[in-house]
Amino acid sequence: MRRAAWGAAVVLMLTGAARAAPPSAGRVELVAGEGLNEPFGVEFDRESRTYIVEMGGHRVTVLDAKGARRVLADDFKGPHHLLLGPDGALYVTDTWNYRVRRFDLRTGASTVVAGTGEKGFSGDGGPATAAQFGGIFSIAFDKRTLYICDLDNRRVRAVDLKTGVVRTVAGNGEKGVPRDGEDARAQPLFDPRAIAVDVKGNLYICERGGHALRVVDPAGRIRTVAGTGVAGMSGDGGPALSAQLNGPKHIFVEPSGSVLITDTENHVIRRYSPRDGTIRRVAGTGVLGAGGLGGPALECALNRPHGAVIHPKTGALYIADSENHRVLRVPRDQ
């Protein structure tokens, strides 16, 4: 599969009122943006619907294939992330209600799959629905497991999708920098904010406070792959371990295996390549702003983005440009 390239791609704002140009220009008819309140994440279902989680709006908004908009649910408290599960249901992190909710997209029924609704740390070895979490900011899936980024407890926990039992897979609850090559469960984490899993079973952990990207291999060993640990903006085009990040908030594993890092406080989207260990900027100028719509992705200013994902069918890059209260689409170069 050829990697998507966006360096010279056109950036489109998806507004609530406007309709995009014909697809011959690489544009699609999507509706989003106007009326949004701090969009933090974007997801797509198998019926070409788009889902936007609004942290400030405490809701999930749905856009159908024709652009019609509706609210899926609006009874969250600061939701940060959403993800389609292997069962086709939509899972949402109800962050400050300390739980994960599952939505059956056929019936609209909602159930809690993890968390009691009270903040704390308990429940490993038992049902996830009876376990306490300390702020659920991100989730990830493989075929058998729901992974939960338990930020305030400085742990990543895993729920067996068959049994519903929860356990810790990374983090010992302490705040610190983990040692490379050690058992991830015995090591500290530095404010783990987001997680993602690749097809090889590697679990990536994005640390907001550690300004770094870690990875836990299938054997359970952790190591740092990006970031010096000091906040800053440097290193594009070179080794990721020599680059500076600044409060990254989201990660997404591309089909190629590369990892998109939403480098929030630098107002950019960056790509880490595990093949050669390099990092580079793919969207955003590095300066807070809102200008540049209609131009190259690298010349489009962002304002504290909190999510970046790839559309599974078109290969386009979608950015939750949170403090600009909009969603951006960057078409894949043809």
Regions found by a protein language model. Give the residues of each.
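Gly/Pro-rich loop segments of beta-rich domains
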Residues: 22-40, 51, 56, 66-80, ...
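Blade-level signature of beta-propeller repeat domains, shared across WD40, Kelch, NHL, RCC1
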Residues: 304-334
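Short loop/turn segments immediately following the C-termini of beta-strands
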Residues: 55, 95, 151-152, 208, ...
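A short loop-to-beta-strand structural motif that recurs across blades of beta-propeller domains
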Residues: 58-61, 98-101, 154-158, 165, ...
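Residue-level detector of Asp-centered blade-edge/turn motifs that repeat once per structural unit
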Residues: 44-47, 84-87, 141-143, 197-200, ...
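Conserved beta-propeller blade signature
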Residues: 49-51, 89-91, 146-148, 202-204, ...
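Bacterial N-terminal signal peptides that target proteins for export
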Residues: 1-7
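Bacterial N-terminal signal peptides
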Residues: 7-15
